[in-house]
C-alpha cells in the first residue's frame, strides 16, 4: 500500500514520466516486451481521486483478508488478480495501439470478491450512498454494472479489469479453499 501511494504521488506531482513509462499498453506489451508494466502499472494511479478510491477500498478489505488467509496467500491473491485483470485487458485490447491502462483495480476487485466469498453475510456500501447492501447482492450488481459499462461506457475506466480481477479472486478461492464455496452456498441457500 505504501509503495503504491508513494509511486502514485511521485508520478502525479513530481515525475509524470513514471506514469507514462509504466502504463499498461496491451498493443505494445508483447511487441515491445513491456512485460514489467503488467505489475508496475498496478502500483501507479493516474490521479489523486483514483488513488484515494482504490486505497480506501484496499484498506477496508485487504487487511481483514490478510488476517484471514495469511500474508503469503494474500499476496498471491493480490498479484493473481492484478495479472488476471491485465491478461484479460491485453486480450481485448491487444490490437488497439491507443489503449492504455493504469491502477490496481483488478487486484482490488480480486480481494473484494474473495472477501465476499469468505464473508457473504457482510453488508457493503457504495460511496456515497449510505445504504447497506448484502455482500452477495453487491457482487451481482458490481458484475452486472461492470459488464454493462465495459460494453457501453467511454469513461476511461478499465471495467474489464474489474470483471477479470473479480473472476481472478473467485478462481483463487476455488483453487486454494474450495470448501469456502460450500460454506457460501450453505449461507445463501
Residue ranges and their predicted role:
Residues 1-189:
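A detector for small-residue-rich transmembrane helices and their helix-helix packing motifs
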Amino acid at each position: 500500500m505504501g509503495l503504491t501511494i508513494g509511486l502514485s504521488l511521485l508520478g502525479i506531482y513530481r515525475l509524470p514520466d513514471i506514469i507514462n513509462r509504466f502504463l499498461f499498453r496491451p498493443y505494445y506489451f508483447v511487441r515491445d516486451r513491456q512485460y514489467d508494466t503488467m505489475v508496475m502499472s498496478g502500483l501507479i494511479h493516474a490521479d489523486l481521486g483514483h488513488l484515494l478510491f482504490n486505497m480506501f477500498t484496499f484498506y477496508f478489505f485487504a487487511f481483514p483478508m490478510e488476517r484471514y488467509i495469511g500474508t503469503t496467500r494474500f499476496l498471491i491473491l493480490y498479484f493473481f488478480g492484478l495479472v488476471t485483470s491485465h491478461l484479460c485487458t491485453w486480450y481485448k485490447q491487444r490490437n488497439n495501439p491507443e489503449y492504455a491502462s493504469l491502477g490496481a483495480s483488478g487486484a482490488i476487485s480480486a480481494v473484494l470478491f474473495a472477501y465476499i466469498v469468505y464473508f457473504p453475510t457482510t453488508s457493503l456500501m457504495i460511496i456515497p450512498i449510505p445504504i447497506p447492501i448484502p455482500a452477495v447482492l453487491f457482487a451481482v450488481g458490481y458484475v452486472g454494472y461492470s459488464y454493462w459499462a465495459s460494453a457501453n461506457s467511454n469513461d476511461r475506466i478499465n471495467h474489464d479489469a474489474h470483471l477479470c480481477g473479480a473472476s481472478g479472486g473467485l478462481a483463487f478461492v476455488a483453487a486454494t479453499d474450495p470448501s469456502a464455496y460450500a460454506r457460501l452456498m450453505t449461507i445463501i441457500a
